[in-house]
């Protein structure tokens, strides 16, 4: 079957980013934060949350920044999100993560820790930026998170000139039970765009068109097909003048040292509709037991997915692996930007949704 088209539009978008601070304790090659250091108070966070749940039927909120672990009341922020009946993920470089903080975040209700560890970072715990050192640090951080009862995933910036890092990160997630999620964010030339004008509703325009080395979805798809014989599970179309897949989702099942990439079937198409009807919102962050994964793999194969997944059913405990590829804002020759349709990774400012990767650069 063709990839499932994610029905996330308007108020039915199930995800957003809660932006709680600016300032960071490392430096990244492709950072899009532009505002000076500062943090939202708990009262301001509560106001943000109230506005966000009114504007979207949210299922999951991801806490970001800046580096959110620098916020002195991060566990209280997590608890505030949970009080709205939402799942909570945290984007962090992991530098400040330790046992006491992870225990506090677990108690507050955190579900998922997305660790951003890249070779393009300048950070004190990565003096050696070799591929082996980066992979080792990613796994060490994931195991620390897992030991404290939290689900771990990775955020990796994907560069066209470094395809081996994408391949390595996928292999790492497939091979290790401590890792369940991988978000691959395609590098875009944010610095080269300069100031951005307009709005997501009316259209966005960059002052300059930027460089020509953007990581686009055709590059992601080719790498997955060539290295993993994987086809997309689901897709999210772009919004703007250019038509492309802003998100591609891949799903794999792993067990006993082997992995198989699945394709969507009638099961997932029905599940999307049924869960939306029963819960009043779409599901964003999937959390299932090994037994549920076994049932899902079996039904997926029977109802039109990839039959190769069946070979895992007798291999003991199974784990689903979720991988998302994201193409950044893409300019045409006049600087007009195409973005994710109703961007899932949007922040709520001035009573409107703004793509998190552009929000600091848009002149309003």
Model-derived regions, located:
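Canonical Radical SAM [4Fe-4S] cluster-binding loop centered on the CxxxCxxC motif
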Residues: 7-44, 55
């Amino acid at each position: 079957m063709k990839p499932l088209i994610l029905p996330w539009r308007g108020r039915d978008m199930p995800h957003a980013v809660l932006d709680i601070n600016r300032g960071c304790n490392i430096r990244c090659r492709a950072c899009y934060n532009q505002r000076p250091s500062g943090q939202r108070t708990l009262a301001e966070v509560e106001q943000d949350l109230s506005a966000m749940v009114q504007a979207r039927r949210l299922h999951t909120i991801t806490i970001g920044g800046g580096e959110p672990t620098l916020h002195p009341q991060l566990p209280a922020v997590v608890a505030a999100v949970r009080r709205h009946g939402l799942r909570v993920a945290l984007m962090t470089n992991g530098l400040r993560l330790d046992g006491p903080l992870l225990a506090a975040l677990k108690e507050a209700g955190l579900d998922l820790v997305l660790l951003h560890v890249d070779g393009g970072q300048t950070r004190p715990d990565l003096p050696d930026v070799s591929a082996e050192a980066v992979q080792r640090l990613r796994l060490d951080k994931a195991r620390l998170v897992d030991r404290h009862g939290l689900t771990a995933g990775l955020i990796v910036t994907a560069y066209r000139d470094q395809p081996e890092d994408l391949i390595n990160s996928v292999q790492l997630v497939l091979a290790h039970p401590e890792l369940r999620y991988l978000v691959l964010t395609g590098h875009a030339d944010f610095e080269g765009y300069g100031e951005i004008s307009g709005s997501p509703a009316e259209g966005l325009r960059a002052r300059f068109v930027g460089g020509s080395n953007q990581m686009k979805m055709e590059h992601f798809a080719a790498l997955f097909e060539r290295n993993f014989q994987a086809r997309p599970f689901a897709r999210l179309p772009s919004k703007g003048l250019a038509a492309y897949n802003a998100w591609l989702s891949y799903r794999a099942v792993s067990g006993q040292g082997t992995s198989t990439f699945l394709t969507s079937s009638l099961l997932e198409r029905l599940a999307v509709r049924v869960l939306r009807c029963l819960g009043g919102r779409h599901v964003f962050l999937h959390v299932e037991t090994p037994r549920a994964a076994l049932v899902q793999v079996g039904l997926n194969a029977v109802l039109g997915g990839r039959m190769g997944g069946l070979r895992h059913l007798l291999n003991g405990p199974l784990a689903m692996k979720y991988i998302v590829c994201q193409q950044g804002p893409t300019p045409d020759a006049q600087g007009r930007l195409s973005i994710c349709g109703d961007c899932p990774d949007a922040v709520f400012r001035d009573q409107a949704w703004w793509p998190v990767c552009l929000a600091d650069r848009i002149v309003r």
